[in-house]
Amino acid sequence: VKLLDTLNEAQLAAVTNIHGPTMIIAGPGSGKTRVLTFRVAYLMHSGIDPFSILALTFTNKAAREMKNRIEQLYGTDARNLWMGTFHSVFSRILRSEADKLGYPSNFTIYDSEDAKNLLKTIVKEMGLNDKLYKPGYVLYRISLCKNNLIGPEAYAVNTDLISEDEGNGRPKMAEVYKNYTKRCFRAGAMDFDDLLLKTHELLERFPDVLYKYQHRFKYVMIDEFQDTNFLQYSIVKRIADVFQNIAVVGDDAQSIYAFRGASIANILNFEKDFPEVKTFR
């Protein structure tokens, strides 16, 4: 394939190694996303159905660039790829499965402003000090918990979190979290973190749904793997468990999303979770 002539030896090996778990570690500016793009193109060139390829990115811009590049090479077939950010791909899955979790398929997605406004209302209704329970801080706290699979019930009995809240003069944090969760559900709404959390719940609670997506996505790829957090990795690990054709592209020297609970541990865990992994540097 002429396309591959532009790759160096290491990149070529990473692109053409399409079976089994693969980790591609490269520094900034070394064309990591390009490797992933070529890998998708190579899969399609090898006759793999684009509908069975899941490629996850961190920004809409990266997803758009990859999709456009592949469309230039393969035309409209590229539109069948499941390619986008974690949030956009998971919201697409949730739209078709939401009823199982008691949500309408046209559930609303709250952005951070919507979420903060709801929290402001809850704090006011509970008669709490809005200087202590600032919506931005409360949302950050809830977000961190959701991304570590700590729901309102688990929060309420977590002695570390409770004593931290009490020490900071916020003893009602668990109750705020509980009310926030209830109100979102009642409104048929999910916030950004719910798009991950509810996908995880869906795959955990419904083996038939897990089976469906495990067998749909025979090839899974993640860009900027060092930026994935515990929850994102948990979901993708479940999906890739059957075919094990998972490729992650990461840079062990940078983690720009650390504030989202992103975890360098994922890079280390990957080798443990997928012992057959081939690593390319």
Can you say where each PLM-predicted feature lies in the sequence?
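Conserved helicase NTPase motor core
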Residues: 6-16, 20-24, 54, 62-63, ...
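Short acidic/histidine-centered micro-motifs embedded in hydrophobic/aromatic stretches
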Residues: 86-89, 138-141, 145, 198-199, ...
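Glycine-/small-residue-rich beta-strand-loop submotif within the FAD-binding core of flavoenzymes
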Residues: 272
